[in-house]
Swiss-Prot record:
UniProt lineage: Eukaryota, Fungi, Dikarya, Ascomycota, Taphrinomycotina
GO cellular component: cytosol; nucleus
Keyword field: Cytoplasm, NADP, Nucleus, Oxidoreductase
PANTHER family: DEHYDROGENASES, SHORT CHAIN, ESTRADIOL 17-BETA-DEHYDROGENASE 8-RELATED
Gene Ontology molecular function terms on file: 3-oxoacyl-[acyl-carrier-protein] reductase (NADPH) activity
Annotated NADP(+) binding sites: 17, 53, 80, 113, 145, 149, 178, 180
Active site (UniProt): 145, 149
EC number from the UniProt entry: 1.-.-.-
Protein's UniProt name: Uncharacterized oxidoreductase C922.06
GO biological process: lipoate biosynthetic process
Length: 258
């Protein structure tokens, strides 16, 4: 793994995946700047912690300028901020729709809008990893979140093509279900939901923040300079096929072992 003492900017840095991203990039020897909407004290393992709402242009522009002034030019941007409202579509308020789309899609647009010119100016390229989701490919609830994640994939492709000649790579890491603190309340209310969800994954388990972080580190590595405009799925085989359906289809076949 290439370690260059890079400046790595991570949004959503106080969440389950964000905390692990900060920790693992710091362990690589990188200087990490963590941005989150919550109090900066919640951001751990970062050389610089800032509070900002990524969907607010003035806040994110100010935060990015602070990162550059304090740590230097940004080499790696990881857009990890996001939130999903699982309200059924017919009950979803306009405000909730706007909030999810603004946070996931507009937030990613804004961070890249302000970081890419700096990357281009420094003349040595850079790597951007947008945290997508399998929700951007199949419907698993959260319609606004799903629509925004699908849009993020096309934005990623557009930016990869536009800025590839400048050595700026843009990719998506799309996780499946990741067992993080965000799921704690749901698991408390429905203790069996975790086991039921595992049945949908060919590998027989849910993902961890570490699974996602390792994939992001791979995409961010400058050694992988021929990888851009693509999506790396960290989904335990979820999009490859449905083991529950297969099991039902072949349930009467004694020769089928699953």
């Amino acid at each position: 793994m290439t370690v260059e003492g890079r400046v790595v900017l991570i949004t959503g840095a106080a969440g389950g995946i964000g905390k692990v991203l900060c920790k693992m990039f710091t362990e690589l020897g990188d200087r990490v700047a963590g941005i989150d909407i919550v109090d900066p004290s919640k951001v751990q393992d970062a050389a610089l912690a800032l509070q900002a709402d990524v969907s607010k242009a003035d806040q994110i522009e100010t935060a990015i300028e602070k990162v550059i002034q304090t740590l230097g030019p940004i080499d790696v941007l990881i857009n990890n901020a996001g939130l999903a409202d699982d309200t059924p579509f017919e009950q979803l308020s306009h405000e909730s729709w706007d909030h999810d789309v603004s946070l996931v899609l507009r937030g990613n647009y804004l961070t890249q809008r302000y970081v890419i010119p700096h990357m281009a100016k420094q003349g040595k390229g850079g790597s951007i990893v947008n945290i997508g989701s399998v929700n951007g490919h199949i419907y698993l609830g959260s319609p606004a979140y799903s629509a925004a994640k699908a849009g993020l994939e096309n934005l990623t492709k557009a930016l990869a093509v536009r800025y590839g000649p400048l050595g700026i790579r843009v990719n998506v890491c799309a996780p499946g279900t990741i067992w993080s603190p965000a799921w704690d309340e749901r698991f408390k209310k429905h203790p069996d939901v975790g086991d039921r969800m595992k049945r949908w994954y060919p590998v027989g388990r849910l993902g961890t923040p570490e699974d996602v972080a390792r994939a992001v580190i791979f995409l961010a590595d400058s050694k992988n300079s021929f990888i851009t405009g693509t999506t790396l799925y960290v989904d335990g085989g979820l999009l490859a096929g449905n083991p529950c359906l297969i099991q039902d289809i072949y349930s009467e076949n004694n020769n089928f072992v699953f």
